[in-house]
Amino acid sequence: MEERLSKISVDGMREIRDLDGSLDGRCVSVRGFVFKSSCTGKYIFIVLRDGGCTVQCMCEKPTDGSGGLTMPEFSSLRKVTHESYIEIRGRVVKQGMEISGCSKKDIEVRILGFRVLSIADKSLPFAMKDVSATAEEREKNPTLQNVAYHIRLDNRAMDLRAPQTRATFRVVDGVMFFFRTYLRQNGFMEIKTSKLIGSSSEGGANLFSVDYFKRKAFMAQSPQLYKQMAIVGGFKRVYEIGHVYRAEESNINRYLSEFVGLDMEMEICTDYNDVIRFIHSMLVSIFDNLKKEYGEELETIRAFHAFEDLKYRRDPVVLTHRECVDLLLNEGVEMGYEDDFNSESEKKLGSVVRRMHGVDIFVIKDYPISTRPFYTYRDEEKGITRSYDFILRGQEILSGAQRVSIYKDLVKYVEEHGISPSSLGGYLESFKYGAPPHGGCGIGLERLMKAYFGMGDIRCFSLFPRDPNRLYP
């Protein structure tokens, strides 16, 4: 078979996505997974899938002088299992009638030869047709099975072949790219901070501990202190895309034990409102570019999970913490001016702001001192901080603030939070030698995507999610 295949002259190896009617009559070579196959006795039909694209391939049962497959080859092709990875050489033929069930609807490939590069086991953990069916297709075909999400996660490599999953991680990649691009275009330098630390970065108890050469170390729950030290070191604008670790036994649909942090820190030239405006402009740029560059992926996801286009403005809608408390009190929600918002109150605020301002994203600033970490700049007289959260579709997607840059104030606030200054020695020492005013934010990538699409399960946006119940695969 290999020898005969090599004698079939083709016009190069082609991606399925690049096949179109202009190749009518030309011989090509394509590779992909066997998504579907059927045999009517006289004909074999195979739907070949590569990434998010599919094409129908067909061959006729051979007769003497047919010039196609031999009878042994025809019999062998009929036995190829679903999800096997194969190469097909054949002639592109333009079709007069639309081919349903394929992304390439006006062409098919008439098979002249093939080879199996990797055979798939007959016993698949789930049928790809079941996880590839859109909401509309499910309504029309009630025989399609619902595959439990934990089974999909247990077999994540195969699940990544599903169109919705593939499109999701294409969009996730786009968000990281646009985040990095915007910051680099605005003078930011990328840094990589240590994820092995000697003590808590924020005084919390939710840390993973590891053995580190006969002593205890911890997995970083934030790059916060290192970002600030980079600014103190003279790098005016820095950012990081890196993993963050939180040992929280919380709702696995909302929190991950390991997630990707999009962090940035910058010097402040005027006041902290400049940082708020900059972050909002960055998010607007990301949202604009997603619509412009990832329209196909967004529509693929929409076919499986309906979501509304995001509503936002060029300039941010900014409300103070006190103003937001007043809005909630008017809605009958009981809370005080010193209280932080929980997930329910954030959701309520999201609907109120959408009704009042017609946007899905807004900023809450000036949180009470009691609700923020020790490194947050304070206005002691007013009892508030120069801090801010961004709320997207009723969910917090980032938290940030102007930071404390005066050494004696920082030591005082550390002690007030019940943290020993000696445990933060390297961080605190750096502020002894002068520090510019600075601020920034930390964005949870998976949380941002969850809010953007309005989905209920954050694990959908982690390639191999880690939560209190999952350490596999």
UniProtKB/Swiss-Prot annotation:
Stretches of the chain forming a coiled coil according to its record: none
EC number annotated for this UniProt entry: 6.1.1.12
Annotated residues for binding of ATP: 246-248, 254-256, 396, 444-447
GO biological process: aspartyl-tRNA aminoacylation
Enzyme class: ligase
Pfam families registered for this protein in UniProt: tRNA-synt_2, tRNA_anti-codon
Known catalytic reactions: tRNA(Asp) + L-aspartate + ATP = L-aspartyl-tRNA(Asp) + AMP + diphosphate
Family of the protein in this entry: Belongs to the class-II aminoacyl-tRNA synthetase family. Type 2 subfamily.
Protein name in UniProt: Probable aspartate--tRNA ligase, cytoplasmic
Species: Encephalitozoon cuniculi (strain GB-M1)
Lineage of producing organism: Eukaryota, Fungi, Fungi incertae sedis, Microsporidia, Unikaryonidae
